[in-house]
Amino acid sequence: MSGTILITGATSGFGQATARRFVKEGWKVIGTGRRAERLEALAAELGQAFHGIAFDITDEDATEKALAALPDGFRDIDILVNNAGLALGTAPAPQVALKDWQTMVDTNITGLLNITHHLLPTLIKQKGIVVNLSSVAAHYPYLGGNVYGGTKAFLRQFSLGLRSDLHGKGVRVTSIEPGMCETEFTLVRTGGNQEASDNLYKGVNPITADDIANTIYWVASQPKHININSLELMPVNQSFAGFQVYRES
């Protein structure tokens, strides 16, 4: 099995690990991200099988131009992995800057919609696969995760709705919903506080970027008559939080 896969957010974490896994398996990989220097480093590592394009997926015009400029050998995209996303801050809603909420919505939702919409004709032609990186936060709320969880719930429902809209086209759509994962994502969430980021995972043995890359490859490797609607995974040391109870004095 081989083909062409486009991965958003390929400059670190899940995206970078997925790029490495698919190149190893003989695929051509298009990696997107904002940090051109990281894409260049990944291209130097992975060779001609990797094509990096630096642009902002929240910008519709930039997205259209970047996809239109793809080299001929990378145009027939078989898999889209919507991985780009972020969480900003750990504070409860009254203490959050509105711009952080807007940034999460723009990146996690608007950017995903831009690139998915532009690639749908190709994915239909190729009878391809759309993999959306959601989160267990789509199901289970946690303190400080209000808007982030809301964006991931959108992704999950969008995945199910997109599959319904593409019924009969041979396109598969999967929502992957990880629990605690240790990547650069958490360092962004904590505003660059390495100690706070490390403490979140202390003693947890969290999911790794390679675990998610292997999961995405497994989804893509299923027979064409099977669609994985959603896939929820957690570290063994993470389970479901109990309800909060406020007790009046």
From Swiss-Prot:
This is Serine 3-dehydrogenase. The lineage of its organism: Bacteria, Pseudomonadati, Pseudomonadota, Alphaproteobacteria, Hyphomicrobiales. The keyword Oxidoreductase applies. Substrate binds at S135. It holds the Pfam family adh_short. Homotetramer. NADP(+) binds at residues 6-30. Catalyzes the oxidation of the hydroxyl group of serine to form 2-aminomalonate semialdehyde which is spontaneously converted into 2-aminoacetaldehyde and CO(2). Also acts on D-serine, L-glycerate, D-glycerate and 2-methyl-DL-serine. Does not act on O-methyl-DL-serine and L-threonine. Keywords: NADP, Oxidoreductase. Its EC number is 1.1.1.276. It catalyses: L-serine + NADP(+) = aminoacetaldehyde + CO2 + NADPH. It comes from the Bacteria. Belongs to the short-chain dehydrogenases/reductases (SDR) family. The active site is at Y148. GO terms for molecular function: serine 3-dehydrogenase activity. SMART domains: PKS_KR.
